[in-house]
Each structure stands twice: as structure tokens, then as C-alpha cells.
A protein has these predicted regions:
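N- or domain-start disorder-to-order transition segments that initiate the globular core
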Residues: 1-28
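His/Glu-based metal-binding/catalytic segments typifying zinc-dependent metallopeptidases
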Residues: 22-38, 45-46, 217-274
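Short, polar/flexible loop-turn hinges at active-site or ligand-entry regions and domain interfaces
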Residues: 111-118
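Low-complexity, intrinsically disordered Gly/Pro/Thr-rich segments
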Residues: 388-398
Length: 412
């Protein structure tokens, strides 16, 4: 059974529910997804949203972290908050027989989060320790440096984890203000599945929804950026060179030709062995253990990025080869053999991407969130099946902006 999209009216607000019934799983899987509420909202307080999701994992003010966690464990219930760039998510999972208790506990949590200075100090200490450990994680450093270069002066410029300095300046009132603004009916999408009917789910979660305020509708804004051919190298005592690269890729998440980007991305660097980057950089020249590249399509932004590790002595050669390969890819496109192999994999592996309830719900949510029809994936596969070599290569050639590669390198 595939997911359905319906709405439940709460306080005059039509809240969407993405739901799939699966009778052979006696579980509840529930997500409250708040739009335009990820670390896109950090603004000048880098790490704010990350800390806000962490404090919701600290239990209620009355019970505290340990007692709340003990009750969850005793009843095999998970309540977890997290965030991406565009969304803030609160998730429940439990057995069906414990679903009412799980929802009741979430209701308690939302009514009275553990907004105490001791909780904030605790999660700040944990986050600061994490960031200190990351000071010697050169992948982490190179990746964050790429974001700072590629997305300069946008909400994507800063890491979601924040910095040691920015974390130290965040106060309890900042978190309270963010969560008060974020957790509202107007920005909510519900994703639910398990051994329930649609009516049972609505009845189960209604107490939570009735306690949420209406809030203001927050519109997602596109992030405009234009990559340039540039590079920045950090000198560190490392045995390898860490090379991250990225560029603009000017498409919209609702573009009807995105299936071509999917195929192009797979051939250039997304397919592992057999991809253009892996074949030329690792297999033919032995410059790296692995090399990847991928076109990432999001509601607010779309871009091409990739990475590789190589010896310090061959870093420049590997960097120049990446630029050359991307240039040639845009200029000459792909071969019929590459297109056929990509079609076979993408079409043949589709069933594996729909095996679990979580996979299907995630796909249904992504399509809804991007404003696409629920049969979009089926139509996309048909388009991939019928894609002609000339059409794909013309599409690739039209995206010359991918050549404007920005490099972030950490090496000795």
C-alpha cells in the first residue's frame, strides 16, 4: 500500500498528513516535520537550531533527562528531535500497544521542555567537546571550508554544528524563542505509518496538535549563489590531502528535466566504481582510494559537489584532473555505454528504494514537500527509460556553470 496525503483541520488550519497503513508491523512511526525551520534559521547564531533540537532530547523540566529517558526505555519508546537545513523534526517510534503513552509523553515534552540552565550547559559542553574533536578531522574541516567558500553570504555558509565561539554565545532565551516560533501548526507536516487506520492516527495525535499554537506561515526562500573558479588550501600535519569541490547547478527542485540531472550525476560521480571520476582518478591513475561527485537537489538550493583523498604529493595533479574531467563531461557528454549502464542500475535498483515503510514514507514526504505529484517517481523512471543520448548530452552541455569549481583543500 502506498502513502496517502490527507489533511486534518486543527484550529482552522489544514495540516497535511502523509500516511501509510502497514498491518504486518505493530508499530507507530510518527514524525512532526516543521518547514523552513532547520539551520537555515541560525542567522547570526550558528549552531542555534542544533542546540534547540538537542535540548528537546533532554526530557521535560519536571522529570529531567535521566528519568524521562528511563520511562522511554521501560516502554520501548523513542522520542528524538533533529534538524536538517530546511526542516526541524520530532520523531516518535513505539510498539502499537504503547502508542498512546508515547504520544502522551511527547505532549508532556512539548508543554514543558527542559528549559533549564543546567540542561543548556550540558548540551553546550557536549557540543563543544564534539567540535574540539573535529579540529583534527580533516574531512570535516575541508567540507566546512567548502561550504564557507561556495555559499558565502548565505544561510549555508556556516556549519549546522556551529563553532566553539558561536555556541558559547547562545543563551536559553534564544532557544526558547526559536522553538516557540518553530513549533506551530502553520508550518507542520505530519508523516505517519504503521498498523493504524487513517482515522486511528488522527485520533491518536489530535491531543498534541490541539496544544500547538497556530503560528505564522513561514515561506521557504531560494538561496541564490554563483560559484567561481577558486581554491583555498589549509596547511595541516596530515598524511593525505583532503580535496572537496563544488559548483552551482542551476535547476529548480520542481524542474521537469531533473531526471536528466539524476542520470548525469550518476554517470559523472555518483555510481562509485564505473563513474567517470572513479574510473579516471582511481582505476586508471591510482590517485585516490575513492572519488565521488553528486548533484544535490533541494527546495532552497541545488549544487554539484564531490570529494577525494590523495597523497600530498599528488594533490595538485588530482585537483587539475577533476577540473579537466568536469570540463570534458560538459563539452563531450556521455557515451551510449555509460547511459545504458546508468539506466540499468537506476531502473533495476528502484524496488530496493521502496522496501521499508520508512523509505516509502520518506519518499512520499520528499515529493509532497517539493510540490511534486505522488506518481512523480514512476513517471521519472519512464522518462529515464526513454532518455536518448543526444537529449542527455544537450542537457549536460547547457549547464556550463558546473565548470566553475571551487576547491577546498587540507594538506601538508
Amino acid at each position: 500500500m502506498s502513502a496517502t496525503i490527507k489533511h486534518i483541520n486543527i484550529k482552522g488550519i489544514e495540516v497535511p498528513i502523509i500516511f501509510e497503513e502497514q498491518k504486518d508491523l505493530p508499530i507507530l512511526n510518527l514524525q512532526l516535520v516543521f518547514q523552513n525551520s532547520g539551520y537555515i534559521q541560525d542567522k547570526d547564531k550558528s549552531g542555534l537550531v542544533n542546540l534547540s533540537s538537542s535540548i528537546l532530547n533532554e526530557g521535560t523540566k519536571e522529570l529531567g533527562s535521566s528519568n524521562f529517558a528511563q520511562i522511554l526505555d521501560e516502554n520501548a519508546i523513542t522520542i528524538h528531535s533533529s534538524n536538517g537545513f530546511e526542516t526541524f523534526v520530532i520523531e516518535i517510534s513505539s510498539l502499537k500497544e504503547q502508542s498512546k503513552k508515547a504520544v502522551s509523553l511527547l505532549n508532556d515534552l512539548l508543554k514543558s521542555p527542559n528549559f533549564t540552565q543546567s540542561s543548556l550547559d550540558k548540551i553546550k559542553t557536549i557540543q563543544t567537546g564534539y567540535l574540539k574533536r573535529k579540529e583534527n578531522d580533516f574531512d570535516f574541516i575541508a567540507q566546512n571550508q567548502l561550504k564557507a567558500l561556495l555559499f558565502k553570504d548565505t544561510a549555508l555558509e556556516n556549519p549546522s554544528s556551529g563553532t566553539i565561539e558561536s555556541i558559547s554565545k547562545i543563551e536559553l532565551k534564544d532557544i526558547e524563542n526559536f522553538l516557540s516560533k518553530t513549533i506551530s501548526l502553520n508550518n507542520l507536516i505530519i508523516v505517519a505509518g504503521g498498523n493504524f487506520t487513517q482515522k486511528e492516527i488522527e485520533t491518536l495525535i489530535k491531543p498534541i496538535l490541539e496544544n500547538l499554537k497556530i503560528g505564522e506561515k513561514s515561506e521557504v526562500k531560494k538561496i541564490d549563489f554563483k560559484s567561481q573558479k577558486s581554491e583555498k588550501t589549509l596547511q595541516r600535519d596530515t598524511e593525505q590531502a583532503y580535496i572537496y569541490f563544488g559548483s552551482s547547478f542551476n535547476i529548480d527542485s520542481k524542474d521537469e528535466e531533473n531526471y536528466k540531472a539524476k542520470v548525469a550525476s550518476f554517470i559523472l560521480g555518483g555510481s562509485g566504481f564505473g563513474s567517470r571520476l572513479m574510473e579516471e582518478i582511481r582505476v586508471k591513475r591510482g590517485l585516490a582510494y575513492s572519488a565521488y561527485g553528486n548533484i544535490s537537489i533541494n527546495k532552497t538550493h541545488t549544487y554539484f559537489s564531490g570529494y577525494l583523498q590523495t597523497k600530498n604529493e599528488t594533490a595538485k595533479e588530482a585537483q587539475e584532473l577533476v577540473s579537466k574531467l568536469v570540463d570534458e563531461f560538459v563539452e563531450n557528454g556521455v557515451t551510449q555505454e555509460e547511459l545504458t549502464a546508468a539506466k540499468n542500475f537506476l531502473l533495476g535498483s528502484e524496488p530496493l528504494r521502496n522496501e521499508t515503510l520508512a523509505q516509502r514514507l520518506n519518499k512520499a514526504f520528499t515529493l509532497y514537500y517539493r510540490g511534486l505529484d505522488q506518481d512523480y517517481s514512476k513517471k521519472e523512471l519512464e522518462k529515464i527509460q526513454n532518455l536518448k543520448l543526444e537529449d542527455l548530452n544537450n542537457y549536460i552541455k547547457s549547464h556550463k556553470e558546473i565548470n566553475n569549481l571551487t576547491f577546498s583543500i587540507v594538506r601538508r
